[in-house]
Amino acid sequence: MSIPITNFTQKEFCCKCGCGSCEVSMKLKETLQIIRNYWGKPIIITSSRRCRTHNARVGGVPNSQHLLGTAADITTEGSIQTFYNFIIQLYKSGKIPDLGYIQLYLNKKFIHVDVRYPKSNTVRNLK
């Protein structure tokens, strides 16, 4: 199944250091687009693809899904907790089957989502 990616540009997925690393999984793009379609409001990608240098600079783990282009940190206007709960409901209802992992960073106001395989089946809330 191919979903048109209408609300995100390729540049939004690129490493924030400017190195030009932009390759991300189509499953990640489609998962984010599905979330955006149901949410009906803009979603901001604060981090997606990372090169090893930038990943180390921001404190990412050495085996980060960001290095593989299978993860994104996202936020939106309003309550991040409400947005997180919304994504969980989409997953539970089968709307985003490729979601492999989700973690809420409440104090930092972003949500990490990835499409790792095999799925970790772990949902984490960090405050």
Spell out what each predicted region is.
Residues 1-38, 116-127:
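Extracytoplasmic cell-surface/polysaccharide-interacting catalytic and binding patches
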Residues 6, 52, 56, 63-65:
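Flexible, active-site-adjacent loop/turn segments at secondary-structure boundaries
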Residues 6-9, 31, 46, 53, ...:
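Residue-identity detector for threonine
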Residues 22-29, 48, 68, 77:
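Generic alpha-helical scaffold signal
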Residues 23-25, 52-55, 90-94:
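A short linear-motif detector with a strong N-terminal bias
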Residues 30-59:
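Extended, low-complexity, intrinsically disordered C-terminal regulatory tails
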Residues 63, 67-71, 76-127:
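Catalytic cores and adjacent binding grooves of peptidoglycan-active enzymes
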